[in-house]
Amino acid sequence: MAQGGEINNDNEKPIFAVLTQYLKDLSFENPNAPRSLRPREKSPKIDININVDANPVGDDNYDVVLSLSVKADDDNDILFHVELVYGGVFHIQNIPQEHIMPLVFIECPRLLFPFVRQIISDATQNGGFPPLWIDPIDFVTLFQRRITAEQKDKPTQSS
């Protein structure tokens, strides 16, 4: 049994553990308040951009970061702009190398997303707007797009 926060490594079993989660950056801009807080006849246009980044940090640990930018505007004004960078450090050990990247870019963000969603909801509500609940994100498709983009960026080798 692991003691004192150590990771248990019995029998080379696969290990996937969340070591920590953290809020790295949060910005909420409400540039046209209080005018932006008035009732509206139609829903604002919401634009959401997300990026997943990951870097190894020490042996078998990965820092996975979700970056979101959420903008809401009506036809004339920006209503709000939220930028959030939220991360987690994950311990991944005794897992085949071919499974590491999907784990880091799909499962890790999937575990972080509910916290990101709650922070965005709280920020918009604290800014005077109804809470914005972001729909679930398909991290599999984002990962596939990332792989496709990386393959396009690789120079072709000619003999």
From Swiss-Prot:
Disulfide bonds: none annotated. The lineage of its organism: Bacteria, Pseudomonadati, Pseudomonadota, Alphaproteobacteria, Hyphomicrobiales. GO terms for molecular function: unfolded protein binding. Belongs to the SecB family. Transmembrane segments: none annotated. Pfam families: SecB. One of the proteins required for the normal export of preproteins out of the cell cytoplasm. It is a molecular chaperone that binds to a subset of precursor proteins, maintaining them in a translocation-competent state. It also specifically binds to its receptor SecA. One of its GO terms (cellular component) is cytoplasm. The gene is secB. This is Protein-export protein SecB. Keywords: Chaperone, Cytoplasm, Protein transport, Translocation, Transport. It comes from Bartonella bacilliformis (strain ATCC 35685 / KC583 / Herrer 020/F12,63). InterPro entries: SecB, SecB-like_sf. PANTHER family: PROTEIN-EXPORT PROTEIN SECB, PTHR36918. Homotetramer, a dimer of dimers. One homotetramer interacts with 1 SecA dimer. HAMAP family: SecB (MF_00821). It is found in: Cytoplasm. GO terms for biological process: protein folding; protein tetramerization; protein transport. NCBIfam families: PRK05751.1-3, secB.
